[in-house]
Amino acid sequence: MRNRTYTADAEPGDTVTVAGWVHEVRDLGGIAFLILRDTSGKIQVKFEKDEMDDDLVETGLGVHRESVISVTGEVDEEPRAPTGVEVTPESLDVIAEAEAQLPLDPSGKVDAELSTRLDNRTLDLRKDEVKAIFEIRAEVQRAVRDKFRDLRATEINTPKIVATGTEGGTELFPITYFGQEAFMNQSPQLFKQLMVGSGLERVFEVGPIFRAEEHNTPRHLNEATSIDFESAFIDHTEAMDVCEAVVTAAYEAVEENCQDELEALGLEEEFERRPRVPAAHLRGGHRAHQRTGELDEQLVWGDDLPTEGEKALGEDVGEHYFITDWPSEIKPFYIKDHDDDETLSTGFDMMHPNMELVSGGQREHRFDHLVAGFEQQGLDPDAFEYYTKMFKYGMPPHAGFGLGGERLIMTMLGLENIREAVLFPRDRQRLSP
């Protein structure tokens, strides 16, 4: 529609054509109102029955909610209208009529279960508060990309179909690839490292990852967005500095540019009090264990921290924090050990009080040590020859991390289920839409 005006741009005295969805119709007798909604907001359309063509009034008042219409008319100032202006229609065209009975109420007046919402995601996204989540998600991705570019990182796109898993194990989706066995990539980790060795030195990626894990919880997905960073000539402490800077940039961008969306979610005041920059570094996974209260008796050095332990630590610390110096035996083969203590790795996790957000560390850049790491974890180095051979050609020291995109949005906005942060989530039960 060449001459269409967004509702937010309609000014008193203008003659405009606005188009969008019928949000609400109210018939008050001699006068009636239709609320039209587009991506920029809403506008009131006024029908004065005694002064308007009967067919125009009948069309406007008879159209079903969520039908797509266009309205041409003059914009008048009206302080009592939801946005302070209203349109007196000269014409109204029904572009696409919606059914009278909808599977859920986009106005939000009638609650729906999450499963119903996800089954009808297109309708669900017409709610202001749901749309706001994805406007914020888009702003977060813009902000992290800008921050990485400020740090002189180059954006890359790595393969999502691979011959071997990044970390081995069973969390892989196998596919048939022209008669060969292949998998959906569970992480861009190995390719990030190859790009560091290529001379690009500092790279990042915002892209999908696939994990065939059995967890089916409010914070797990089988397809997720990973925000990845890798850089030459830095160690794990400098990678943590970058991690802090990126998460902080995301929060600051949302606070600065998404006030309308935060208001739609009821977070305009609460958001400012949410934790943002890591305030505590728990040096040594064993010292993290010591702060888990009654659970400490159940934890054994070398074990990963269970969900209950994460929650106990979150309650104790109260804001974002790092756990560092994890036991080497529970970290992947590419994580470098400390030079002065091979039982401790340079791996780190960045935690929100409610869950893990980031996993990272310094990488093993020495070929012999890398191959030994494969063997210690029962992996065949020959299966990763495309990766390991680069370490014979001059690989610089490097470090990096992967940040869960949906988990960042979930914790930032206080969402109860990670699926609310995904347009069309994929989990163990959901493959459609």
From Swiss-Prot:
Q: Could you give the cofactor binding note from the entry?
A: Binds 3 Mg(2+) cations per subunit. The strongest magnesium site (Mg1) is bound to the beta- and gamma-phosphates of ATP and four water molecules complete its coordination sphere.
Q: Is Transcription found in the keyword set?
A: no
Region (Aspartate) residue spans: 189-192
The record's annotation in Gene3D superfamilies points to: Bira Bifunctional Protein, Domain 2 (3.30.930.10), Nucleic acid-binding proteins (2.40.50.140)
Q: Which cofactor does it need?
A: Mg(2+)
Q: Which UniProt keywords apply?
A: Aminoacyl-tRNA synthetase, ATP-binding, Cytoplasm, Ligase, Magnesium, Metal-binding, Nucleotide-binding, Protein biosynthesis
Where, in this chain's numbering, is Mg(2+) 2 bound?
Answer: E356, S359
Q: Name one Pfam family in it.
A: tRNA_anti-codon
| One BP annotation, GO | aspartyl-tRNA aminoacylation
Q: Where does ATP bind?
A: R211, A212, E213, R219, H220, L221, E356, G404, G405, E406, R407
Which residues bind Mg(2+) 3 per the record? E356
Question: Per UniProt, where does L-aspartate bind?
Answer: E167, R211, S359, R363
Q: What is its EC number?
A: 6.1.1.23
Q: Name one GO cellular component term.
A: cytosol
PANTHER family assigned: ASPARTATE--TRNA LIGASE, CYTOPLASMIC, ASPARTYL-TRNA SYNTHETASE
> How is this protein organized at the quaternary level?
Homodimer.
Q: What is this protein for, i.e. what is its function?
A: Aspartyl-tRNA synthetase with relaxed tRNA specificity since it is able to aspartylate not only its cognate tRNA(Asp) but also tRNA(Asn). Reaction proceeds in two steps: L-aspartate is first activated by ATP to form Asp-AMP and then transferred to the acceptor end of tRNA(Asp/Asn).
* Family stated for the protein in its record: Belongs to the class-II aminoacyl-tRNA synthetase family. Type 2 subfamily.
Q: What is this protein called?
A: Aspartate--tRNA(Asp/Asn) ligase
